[in-house]
């Protein structure tokens, strides 16, 4: 046992060694002895820094070192010790048969092993070649954490260079320390291998044979067409066919929705583009992308950066492409289930971007409905998926043709161009909103309470304000998370990971981020203006209604005073109109008549003058 005075040993490391040498439990309430033969072996001859380096991944504290399961476990389950939690948390998927894992068959599930670049391989040297002796037969902590190894995201079906093959090589007692140090299983892992999840298919090159086999299967099922029909269809599908520009930009025309068209006349679903080919290849089915006698490997290796655009993909097509290009099951799940959340994720051989656009047809019932756009960007190519027709791929291809000879196109640039074109699609709508907001604001401020009749031509003002605010909220919902996605993608450009975007793309992504931030700020400003205009309009309407009510009350008050003046006159005339004896009835002449009429007029005039004097009317 090393001395405490000769060198400085970490507290957890020394206590671990001391507890092991004294054969006593570390805690009084531990259910099993600490001298178990499953204890993680540490060479006492190691220097403190070396021992600490050997346990860095697992942690250098007492509770962070690997501990075996209890020997008193029942029914094959480990006892839970709250004082000694496991050093590695269990994975979310605790079973290889979890629904989140996608394997072709049960045979693939059985052939699960640790990859060569698993983080635990760093520790393999210490517990397999201790003091130059083989310890293969000794119990290893790796055997106790097999559940973690299976549930870890760093697993894939066995291959020729699997974990077990390395164990077979280490089983030879004649192996030297230099051979162990040079072996790939004991090499120091890079940052990519430690933190990036890998796909089930760990092959560096795509398996184009999977696409070729699937093509043969689909061609065999296409027997109802004659050979001439198939050739004509392929000849038509492989021509360059870009839609026309509308007002300077391409807009999807819903031509095929007016009446039912044949299978051949339906819109293209697959588009293969590379700057080395003279034309773009369009097809309805994936197997139609290649000629007779041509393989997908010849197509994708035709030179330059390739781009495969898939519109309205079927689940079978997604899984075939995932199997051929080694796309992770999590990415396949996001594409199949049409994940709405915009994000960027890095995997071992590619990075995955989810972006959202919208339906740009005002005549469509799904106008401004969000459309999901998925980008799987490899180092030498890109695959895009979208569930609805969208103009962005055609716009980017046209842009690449225009810039041909001025710039070298790569997969990262195509991804940037798609994000940029999607962002630019919001600009015309924001300009339209700006004009509408200025018109509404000026019309509301021009309303004056002295001109009540001017309110009548603006009966739809509230409706216009409501529609404009609805459009603003829809665009804000689409632009809300885009800045975070572009910002996250820009940060990846400065990372050292192999699949991260190249550094020069960060400049272009910064421009896209500036556009998004500016659009969001403008929309928020327009929303505030409309909110203020809405309140001003309602206040102006309330004032106008109050003025109209006051005028009505004034007229009613005048009529009331007039009625008050005429009531005495009606009383006098009513009295003299009775069929009874009245004064002056027998007097000849009209003296009594004019005197009564004059007195009534004098009373009315004097009453009116008196009301005017006191400003009653």
UniProtKB/Swiss-Prot annotation:
It is a multi-pass membrane protein. One of its GO terms (cellular component) is fungal-type vacuole membrane. Keywords: Membrane, Phosphoprotein, Transmembrane, Transmembrane helix, Transport. Pfam families: CorA (PF01544). GO terms for molecular function: magnesium ion transmembrane transporter activity. The chain crosses the membrane at residues 560-580, 590-610. SUPFAM superfamilies: CorA soluble domain-like (SSF143865), Magnesium transport protein CorA, transmembrane region (SSF144083). GO terms for biological process: intracellular magnesium ion homeostasis; magnesium ion transmembrane transport. InterPro entries: Alr1-like (IPR044089), CorA_cytoplasmic_dom (IPR045861), CorA_TM1_TM2 (IPR045863), MgTranspt_CorA/ZnTranspt_ZntB (IPR002523). It is found in: Membrane. Residues 1-141 are annotated as: Disordered. Residues 117-136 have a biased composition (Basic and acidic residues). The modification Phosphoserine is found at residues 105, 152, 162, 226, 241. Interacts with sad1. PANTHER family: MAGNESIUM AND COBALT TRANSPORT PROTEIN/MITOCHONDRIAL IMPORT INNER MEMBRANE TRANSLOCASE SUBUNIT TIM8 (PTHR21535), MANGANESE RESISTANCE PROTEIN MNR2 (PTHR21535:SF51). Belongs to the CorA metal ion transporter (MIT) (TC 1.A.35) family. This is Putative metal ion transporter C17A12.14. It comes from Schizosaccharomyces pombe (strain 972 / ATCC 24843).
């Amino acid at each position: 046992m090393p001395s405490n005075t000769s060198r400085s040993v970490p507290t957890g490391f020394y206590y671990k060694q001391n507890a092991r040498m004294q054969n006593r439990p570390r805690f009084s309430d531990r259910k099993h002895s600490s001298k178990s033969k499953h204890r993680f072996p540490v060479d006492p001859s190691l220097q403190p820094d070396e021992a600490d380096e050997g346990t860095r991944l697992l942690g250098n504290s007492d509770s962070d070192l690997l501990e075996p399961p209890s020997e008193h476990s029942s029914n094959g389950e480990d006892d839970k010790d709250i004082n000694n939690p496991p050093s590695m948390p269990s994975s979310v998927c605790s079973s290889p048969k979890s629904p989140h894992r996608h394997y072709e068959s049960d045979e693939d599930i059985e052939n699960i092993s640790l990859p060569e670049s698993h983080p635990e391989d760093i520790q393999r040297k210490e517990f397999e070649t201790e003091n130059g002796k083989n310890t293969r037969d000794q119990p290893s902590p790796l055997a106790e954490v097999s559940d973690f190894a299976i549930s870890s995201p760093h697993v894939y079906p066995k291959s020729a260079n699997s974990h077990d093959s390395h164990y077979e090589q280490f089983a030879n007692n004649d192996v030297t320390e230099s051979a162990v140090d040079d072996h790939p299983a004991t090499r120091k892992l890079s940052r990519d291998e430690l933190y990036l999840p890998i796909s089930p298919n760990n092959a560096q090159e795509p398996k184009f044979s999977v696409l070729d086999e699937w093509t043969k299967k689909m061609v065999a099922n296409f027997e109802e067409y004659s050979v001439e029909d198939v050739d004509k269809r392929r000849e038509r599908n492989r021509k360059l066919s870009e839609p026309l520009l509308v007002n300077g930009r391409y807009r999807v025309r819903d031509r095929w929705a007016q009446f039912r068209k044949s299978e051949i006349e339906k819109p293209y679903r697959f588009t293969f583009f590379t700057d080395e080919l003279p034309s773009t290849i369009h097809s309805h089915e994936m197997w139609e992308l290649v000629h007779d006698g041509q393989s997908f490997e010849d197509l994708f290796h035709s030179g330059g950066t390739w781009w495969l655009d898939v519109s309205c993909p079927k689940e079978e097509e997604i899984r075939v492409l995932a199997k051929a290009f080694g796309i992770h099951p999590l990415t396949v799940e996001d594409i199949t289930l049409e994940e709405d959340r915009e994000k960027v994720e890095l995997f071992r051989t590619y990075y995955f971007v989810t972006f959202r656009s919208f339906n740009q047809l005002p005549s469509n019932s799904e106008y401004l409905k969000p459309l999901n756009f998925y980008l799987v960007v490899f180092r030498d190519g890109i695959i895009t998926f979208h569930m609805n027709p969208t103009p962005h791929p055609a716009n980017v291809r046209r842009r690449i043709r225009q810039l041909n000879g001025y710039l070298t196109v790569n997969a990262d640039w195509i991804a940037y161009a798609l994000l940029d074109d999607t962002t630019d699609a919001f600009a015309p709508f924001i300009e339209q909103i700006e004009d509408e907001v200025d018109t509404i604001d000026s019309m509301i401020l021009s309303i004056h309470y002295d001109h009540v009749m001017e309110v009548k031509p603006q009966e739809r003002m509230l409706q216009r304000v409501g529609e404009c605010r609805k459009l603003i909220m829809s665009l804000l919902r689409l632009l809300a998370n885009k800045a975070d996605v572009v910002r996250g993608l820009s940060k990846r450009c400065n990372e050292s990971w192999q699949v991260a975007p190249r550094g020069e793309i960060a400049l272009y992504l910064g421009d896209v981020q500036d556009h998004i931030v500016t659009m969001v700020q403008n929309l928020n400003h327009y929303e505030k203006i409309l909110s203020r205009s809405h309140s001003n309009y309602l206040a102006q309407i309330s004032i106008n209604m109050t003025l109209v009510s006051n005028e009505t009350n004034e007229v009613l008050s005048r009529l009331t005073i007039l009625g008050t003046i005429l009531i005495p006159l009606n009383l006098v005339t009513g009295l003299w109109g009775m069929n009874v004896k009245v004064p002056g009835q027998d007097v000849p002449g009209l003296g009594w008549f004019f005197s009564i009429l004059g007195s009534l007029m004098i009373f009315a005039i004097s009453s009116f003058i008196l009301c005017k004097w006191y400003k009653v009317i």
